[in-house]
Amino acid sequence: MPFVKYRGANGEWIKLGGGNVRVSNGHTWIPPRARIWDGHNWIKCLEEKHVDEFVATNSGGYWWSDHGNVSHNHFNSLWAPNYPLQGNYRPYHDRFSNNGQHGMIYFNDQDIRNHLAGARIERVELFLYAVHSAYFNGGEAVIGTHNFRGGWSDVFQEVNHGVARARFYGRNTSQWIVLPNWVGDNLRDNLISGITTNGENASLWQYIVFAGTNQGWKAPKLRITYVK
């Protein structure tokens, strides 16, 4: 993408639009905007690409509908409440539930909106670390979104199911999962606030336990590439 530079006081060339120049709109100072004609289209020339990571602020696992979709703070889960998970707990581990489980991952959505305000989203990625799975060779992660406002919900919520799927190839493995760009748009536009893990059924293939925010560098995080 083309860009514009100007000569600084010491003879150095400074790129416009890099946070060092503002223009007045009569009321406030704002980043400059400019376009050039490439012979076919007008191209914005003062935009910059940014890649920001947002570490989750909280996370948790939830029971299925047979226990009211409540968090693992209730009853006796074999996994600590901070672990988001999905899929069937029975018969592999826990006879207490006949159905699958869910997970919710929370972010500082206001901070994300502050970064993305006015931005064009180019790529959205989610980092997950699979601590455990029913099978040694892994399984399938099913990713959704939620719009809970606050640091913690005691009941599982989801507004978009199955927005992305990813194959994990074993226990104690991690990956960046590409999400649709509209997930970033919805975060920017205050339509969603976080991520869910939620298998469709009681299949062991979708039984995966993910690291939560108490697991240090293994904690879930979002990486968003955008231009503004």
Residue ranges and their predicted role:
Residues 29, 35, 42-112, 201, ...:
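Flexible, small-residue-rich N-terminal segments that precede or flank a structured functional core
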Residues 130-195, 213-216:
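Beta-strand-rich interaction/scaffold domains
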Residues 131-134, 199-201, 228:
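Acidic glycine-/aspartate-rich tracts in secreted/extracellular proteins
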Residues 1-49, 223-227:
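Enriched but not universal
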Residues 101-103, 120-122, 139, 173, ...:
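Residues that flank catalytic or metal-binding motifs in active/ligand-binding sites
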Residues 107-110, 117-133, 222:
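A short beta-strand element within beta-rich, extracytoplasmic domains
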Residues 195-212:
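Short beta-strand-plus-loop segments that form exposed binding edges in beta-rich domains
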Residues 106-116, 177-183:
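Signal that preferentially marks extracellular ectodomain short beta-strand elements
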